[in-house]
Amino acid sequence: MFGVYFVLLFLSSALIHVANAGSNAEWRKRIIYQILTDRFAVDDGSTDNPCDPDANQYCGGTWKGIENKLDYIEDMGFNAIWISPIDKNIEGDIDGAGYAYHGYWNTDYESLNEHFGTEDDLVSLITAAHKAGIWVMLDSIVNSMALAPPLADADYSSLNPFNKESYFHPYCLIDWDITDNETNVMDCWQDSGVLLADLDVESSDVSSYLSDHFKSLISKYDFDGLRIDAVKMMNYTFFPDFVDATGVYSVGEVFSYDPDTMCSYMSVLPGVTNYFLQLYINFSFTATGAGFTLIPTYQEVMASNCSKYDSTLMLTFIENHDLYRFPYYTSDQSQIMGALSFVLIWDGIPSIFYGQEQGFNGGEDPANRPALWLTDYDQSNPYYTVIKTMVAFRKFVITQDPDWVTSTYQSIESAVDHYVGQKNDVLVMFNNMGVTNNLTIYEVETNYTANEVVSDVFGHRTLTVGADKTLTASMTNGYPLIMYPHSKMSGFTLPTVNRTVMPSTSATATTTVYTSYYSPSYSARSFTGTGSIFTISSSSRLILSFKTLVFGLGVTAMLFVLFF
């Protein structure tokens, strides 16, 4: 019976791609695995290709490498991947800023990045992904193009097709200390070591080309969605025509922890990256400041500030290529597993950054971008197993209850150390007490029927709801409880979470991190220190962290800087 169910589900996914590929409604059902193309897999699948993140060089990851490792992604259950930008990028080590291995320093919209492969390789990857029921989201650059410094020698003729200075806003650097001038952010240039010339998207020549170009790319390669980089640096007026032209779900990167700024772009885009929630997930699971009481606060702020927009189309995440890895903030296994589970069961479209399944713990870019192949693609890693379990459960719930993806969680109980919430038939209990502690939650009110038996997805056990519809449950060793009616799980078997406690990662004074559960060791930067857990730059764009947590007024003051 299980085999028949699986086949029907697979066929259904294939048919959906033909009929509704790229629609907002269908993207709600997707679970995204974000790939940094250069760091995921090499052509031949080898696992010993050297890669030093600190060198800021190309390490050899390709589209063919991704295709050859789709089974790794498919085994975790992901049904969408987000790949790096595909355009040709500036070559060489630019003024000490490194190479454009990440794909964000584009110079030619009409050519592919040859470091990642050929046109045939890209077509083959997308075809193979679709055959496996996996959609492909393209990271798109529409805000800027890269020039080699210095400005006095800037060669606009090196760019294609925008090969004249007149296609760009006049040079000025964004001043992040100016908080009340949108024009400064939208028209000035970013400082990234290279010159990121800011495209004049208000010009019809520029905007029309970009809309037509990405419409053509989507048609030619059969992309299913777009992630749009640096949305906050662009005028709102550009996006409606661009979104209409491309015709697929587009999620904009709004790198801001201010909910007003974040939600303002929902007026012109289907979805945005939910950095506001990302910050609160981080605080909650690291027991920082107000802890889990921030989750209902988040819900209240969203209801007040963003109620006219559809939050279920936002991207939910805890890591990406611009952020410190979450295990940099905490080495506690249950806190990390809890944060992973939260992302994969919460509202919105979940996105997992490559390497989260292996526990990557690097800090500031480039330490957060090691090569995945140096882990041997370990499928026994506990983080891999929790992702696999939660992805399978989320997909199962969606098949049982299609309205689940448009519903939102209702908070039932929260404190600094725990949170309880329910969405339809899914009840969640999270805590941040760590792997050496247990916590019992007494008589939690639920929406279940009296005396109903519920299954704990995470721990593979059952509990019984009381006659008064309340539930008393214990969270052991800091792990969460994810519950669902036992009667509705008949015939469905979830993967088992490996909860074997792994030794804490130890770091030498060099850039090599040694662990007992990665084979072989991989290179990444690791930091220790004292002080507050977060330091926010004047731009509010970069979170720096140290290992010692500070509670109370320090955190309150930081939140004041961020949001008021």
UniProtKB/Swiss-Prot annotation:
Enzyme Commission number(s): 3.2.1.1
Gene3D superfamilies: Glycosidases, Golgi alpha-mannosidase II
Residues bearing attached sugar chains per UniProt: 181, 235, 282, 305, 438, 447, 498
Residues at the catalytic site: 229 (nucleophile), 253 (proton donor)
Covalent S-S links between cysteines: 51-59, 172-188, 263-306
Record's comment on post-translational modification: N-glycosylated.
Signal peptide: 1-21
Record: residues binding Ca(2+) 2: 229, 253
Membrane topology listed for this record: Lipid-anchor; GPI-anchor
Name used for this protein in its record: Alpha-amylase 3
Prodomain positions: 539-564
A single GO BP: ascospore wall biogenesis
Cofactor needs: Ca(2+)
Species name: Schizosaccharomyces pombe (strain 972 / ATCC 24843)
Primary enzyme class: hydrolase
Site feature Transition state stabilizer, where: 322
UniProt keyword terms in alphabetical order: Calcium, Carbohydrate metabolism, Cell membrane, Disulfide bond, Glycoprotein, Glycosidase, GPI-anchor, Hydrolase, Lipoprotein, Membrane, Metal-binding, Signal
Function: Has a role in cell wall biosynthesis where it is involved in maintaining cell wall strength and shape.
Cofactor binding description: Binds 2 calcium ions per subunit. Calcium is inhibitory at high concentrations.
GO CC terms in record: external side of plasma membrane; fungal-type cell wall; plasma membrane
Gene Ontology MF terms in the entry: alpha-amylase activity; calcium ion binding
Main location: membrane
Protein family: Belongs to the glycosyl hydrolase 13 family.
Keyword Signal in annotation: yes
